[in-house]
């Protein structure tokens, strides 16, 4: 198994993440927040930080998901998304490991499928951490 990406500065609740979501006049961040809250709710071991301008969720210091806003969409992303089962076909991306789901205003979201991906990413990083010991 390859070395896990680590963010040692991840904390239980990062004030910079809260400030990022609180930016005035940024509707896309308000659209992203419920998905980050879902990541936070995965377990008591979830930590967070602002990494590369994205609200990032970790188990301990190992990231599993993030939300990021762009000009016209939100990405709900997964650091090891390539390993996730995606029967609804939501995941996009061509990178070595990462995948994301793009959300746009006015377009429907498959809420159960995206919730399943978040839960699967959390379980996946916990397995990776356990096997890295």
What are the language-model segments listed below?
Residues 1-133:
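Charge-dense, helix-prone N-terminal extensions
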